[in-house]
From Swiss-Prot:
Identified in the spliceosome C complex. GO terms for cellular component: catalytic step 2 spliceosome; nucleus; post-mRNA release spliceosomal complex; Prp19 complex; U2-type catalytic step 2 spliceosome. One of its GO terms (biological process) is mRNA splicing, via spliceosome. It holds the Pfam family SYF2. The gene is syf2. Residues 1-25 are annotated as: Disordered. This is Pre-mRNA-splicing factor syf2. The keyword Nucleus applies.
Length: 240
C-alpha cells in the first residue's frame, strides 16, 4: 500500500492544486466584477440623485427663468461694453452698429415688425395699448441714480410690510424735466394728428359731437362697404 502511494506521479499531485487555483481565479474574477457593478450602481444612484435635485431646482424657478437669465447676461455684457467704450473714448452706439451685420439688422427689423405690427385702427383700447407699449419701450432708466438711491436707503430700499418708505420718494428735477418734455412731445404729436377740420354745412349730420363724428368716419372707412346695402334699403324703406 505504501509502495502504491510512493509511485504517484508529480502530475497527479499537482492536478488538485491547479483545479483549486482555477476555481480561486474564477471566484476572484466574479468578486472583482461584482465590485465593479456595485461601484457603477452607486455612481448611477449618485448621478440620479443629483439630477433629481437639479430638476427640483429648475421646477421651483419661474417659468421664464431661462429667458430672464439670458436677458440679464446680455444686459451685463452690454454694460461692460459701454464702460469699455467710455474708457476708450468711443461712441457706444456707433461701436454697436459696427458689430451688427446687414443680415442681422434686417432680421431684427422684421422681428420688431412682427412683435408690434401696425394693423391699422381697430378700437380705442387697442390704440391706447399700442401707444403704451411704444412709450414704455422708450423709457431709459438711469442706473447711476438707481444705484445711488439703493446705497442711500440701505435696507429700506427693499421695504417689507412694516416699512414706512413707500410714498416718501421724491423724484429728481432731471426726472421731472424728462417727463415734462415727453408729455409736451406727445401733446405736439397729438395736435398734428387731430387738426380741426372745417365743417361742411351741406353734409348729413349723423353724429352727436365731434368725437362721435370722428368715430363714425372711421367706422365708415372700415365697414362702409359691408353696410352700404343696408343703408340703401333703410333709406328706400325696403328694409325687412
Amino acid at each position: 500500500m505504501d509502495k502504491e502511494k510512493a509511485e504517484v506521479s508529480p502530475e497527479e499531485e499537482s492536478a488538485p492544486a491547479s483545479a483549486e487555483d482555477l476555481a480561486a481565479q474564477k471566484r476572484e474574477a466574479r468578486l472583482r466584477k461584482f465590485r465593479e457593478l456595485h461601484l457603477k450602481t452607486n455612481e448611477a444612484r449618485k448621478l440620479n440623485h443629483q439630477e433629481v435635485v437639479e430638476e427640483d431646482k429648475r421646477q421651483k424657478l419661474p417659468s421664464n427663468w431661462e429667458a430672464r437669465k439670458a436677458r440679464l447676461e446680455w444686459e451685463l455684457k452690454n454694460e461692460e461694453k459701454k464702460r469699455e467704450c467710455a474708457a476708450n473714448g468711443v461712441d457706444f452706439e456707433r461701436a454697436k452698429l459696427l458689430e451688427i451685420s446687414a443680415e442681422d439688422a434686417e432680421r431684427w427689423e422684421r422681428k420688431k415688425k412682427r412683435k408690434n405690427p401696425d394693423l391699422g385702427f381697430s378700437d380705442y383700447a387697442a390704440a391706447q395699448l399700442r401707444q403704451y407699449q411704444r412709450l414704455t419701450k422708450q423709457i431709459k432708466p438711469d442706473m447711476e441714480e438707481y444705484e445711488m438711491e439703493k446705497e442711500k436707503q440701505g435696507e429700506l430700499f427693499y421695504p417689507t410690510s412694516d416699512s414706512l418708505y413707500h410714498g416718501t420718494h421724491v423724484p429728481s428735477q432731471s426726472g421731472i424735466d424728462r417727463m415734462v418734455t415727453d408729455l409736451e412731445k406727445q401733446i405736439e404729436k397729438r395736435e398734428k394728428y387731430s387738426r380741426r377740420r372745417a365743417y361742411n354745412d351741406d353734409a348729413d349730420i349723423d353724429y352727436i359731437n365731434e368725437r362721435n363724428a370722428k368715430f363714425n368716419k372711421k367706422a365708415e372707412r372700415f365697414y362702409g362697404k359691408y353696410t352700404a346695402e343696408i343703408k340703401q334699403n333703410l333709406e328706400r324703406g325696403t328694409a325687412v
